[in-house]
Amino acid sequence: MRVVVLGSGVVGVTSAWYLCQAGHEVTVIDREPGSALETSAANAGQISPGYAAPWAAPGVPLKAIKWMFQRHAPLAISLDGTPSQLKWMWQMLRNCDTRHYMENKGRMVRLAEYSRDCLKTLRASTGIEYEGRQGGTLQLFRTAQQYENATRDIAVLEDAGVPYQLLDASQLAQVEPALAEVAHKLTGGLRLPNDETGDCQLFTQRLAKMCEQAGVTFRYNTPVDKLLSEGGKIYGVKCGDEVIKADSYVMAFGSYSTAMLKGLLDIPVYPLKGYSLTIPVKEDNGAPVSTILDETYKIAITRFDNRIRVGGMAEIVGFNTELLQPRRETLEMVVRDLFPRGGFIEQATFWTGLRPMTPDGTPIVGRTPFKNLWTNTGHGTLGWTMACGSGQLLSDLISGRTPAIPFDDLSAARYQSGFSPSRPQHLHGAHN
């Protein structure tokens, strides 16, 4: 079968890889001159299934009001009055109760756990290297309340069979030795030993090369104008004067998926702007070993080989990609506070990207009302964490195989009134 994949970020390239491995003839189309040059370029570097959780959570509406008056707030909102922004925010607010939070987090963890298993298999079969580490993730708490709140997430982890360690402040240095110097600022941490890290862009670009060697065609520098449809099917992709045709089409344009599907399918994917710094390591024993997640500022600090990646924050500002100095100052403040000897911060590279976020936090992966159009988008801040599992899942569906995990509640159909999954959507499917 001929399949066109729209988008060459980590989600698009992993989709292409698994489709190619399933025997399909795959073409990837992207407006950029290469793969992983937008949202996948400089993310936080975490592969953290256990921390997969929606931004829509109990208490977030009140926190958002408080954050409006804080200099180093993790979330910023700039209302532009557009219907798409207002509708998306309203849908997000409706997901901020405990029932929705647990339901959404459950399916996110299910897909993320499966994705890590898929990445492990891919790594073993290809030998791909991307400055990856398997040292786990450590979520740091600065208040007693944060430490107590961790018990809510632990319940989901236990249900999913995810190993964890709840540590007090005196135990943090056993996992991350450099934290011994700042333990007095912290109340404890939640460690997930099975989490991983790695350079998402490096992985994506190397996997794209492997895709090419396996026969995948990449059409870079090719902006897409629209999808052409007739009779409940897509019959082509219009790129300037050219129409590229295939048997099936995969939408993996990230935040731009919503506009590209306008008139065909209404999906609630909205850009969530994030920032990162990439810092050369200064003192090895003053830098992190793996990944730190600062719960207060929602900022991740990840160790690559000779670099530290500091990423986080969320701005609901539409498609604005301006680099704001106050955001850089927040990233610098957090890394200086936790790892004062870790890196040459003055040499850091500053970056911003648009994460494609759904109001319930779960990506939109699967079928659409058009029988040959599929979506793989809306992964938010977890594209790197969920990419391999999403790609394998989509390849299985397109190939007519039954996926290894429950999938009905991952497609756009879940936003339709009266939707109910056709089979139990349990967490343990990730380990089947």
Swiss-Prot record:
Keywords: FAD, Flavoprotein, Oxidoreductase. Pathway: Amino-acid degradation; D-alanine degradation; NH(3) and pyruvate from D-alanine: step 1/1. The keyword Ion transport does not apply. FAD binds at residues 3-17. It is an enzyme of class 1 (oxidoreductase). Gene3D superfamilies: D-Amino Acid Oxidase, subunit A, domain 2 (3.30.9.10), FAD/NAD(P)-binding domain (3.50.50.60). Its cofactor is FAD. GO terms for molecular function: D-amino-acid dehydrogenase activity. It comes from the Bacteria. Disulfide bonds: none annotated. GO terms for biological process: D-alanine catabolic process. Oxidative deamination of D-amino acids. PANTHER family: D-AMINO ACID DEHYDROGENASE (PTHR13847:SF280), SARCOSINE DEHYDROGENASE-RELATED (PTHR13847). This is D-amino acid dehydrogenase.
